[in-house]
Amino acid sequence: MTVKILVVDDDEALAEMVGIVMSTEGYKSVFCHHGEQAFNVFQESQPDLVLLDVMLPGKDGVEICRQIRTVSDLPIIMLTAKSDTADVVAGLEAGADDYIPKPFKPKELVARIKARLRGRSSEGQEEDVDMGDLRINVVAHEVFRGSERIDLTPLEFDLLLTLARSPWKAFSREELLEEIWGYRHPNTDTRLVNVHVQRLRAKIEEDPEHPKIVRTVRGVGYRAGGNCA
């Protein structure tokens, strides 16, 4: 089945270039150039992944990202001409999985897309992994606390499972970027990891300000806390 990519960008020349790149990879592209129309186009097109510009006429990409996240956990990659911390963090906190600054090389965009589309979490033989008082059903991609199901995005699930599968190992942010996002080059922005850990903690920790399940290792990164099996 052909992968469908929704490209939301008011720069029509850039969108056309992205469409050509997507076509060479065998992906189908759907385009939207105005923020006010983006959510309707999303609902009508039912894409597998969204490329979403931050700066759009009518409604900005951060607000659109929040709208999409109310109904879907599909991968969202923000496109931004700004490297400003506030814009990057706002997009990630709104629910974006990744971001790529303009201008970008086509091969870098393709690599980011493939990393987000790649199903990694169900690799391996185990069906359930325990992490603190959480039970992770690997095959079903579900997380439970007792009988309560905790809704995570696929990326949040991957992050939690990666930590749970290597109990007591302290992962550097760079290691997590390679493991979860597929980045294999130096000088990558580690804010991606920090923001997604915050989002994950908000969902799984009973007290996110004093986390017990995903712990910070000062000067290193993050590790699983509690009993993991």
Question: What is the predicted role of each segment?
Answer:
Residues 16-24:
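Charged docking surfaces used in two-component/phosphorelay signaling
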Residues 142, 147-154, 158-212, 218-220:
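Positively charged, aromatic-enriched patches within helix-turn-helix-type DNA-binding elements
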Residues 26-34, 41:
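Short hydrophobic/Thr-rich beta-strand motif most characteristic of the beta2 strand and flanking loop
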Residues 34-37, 60-63:
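Acidic catalytic/metal-coordinating carboxylates
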Residues 66, 70, 75-130, 202:
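Basic, amphipathic DNA-recognition helix from helix-turn-helix-like DNA-binding domains
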Residues 45-51, 56:
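Active-site beta3 strand of CheY-like receiver
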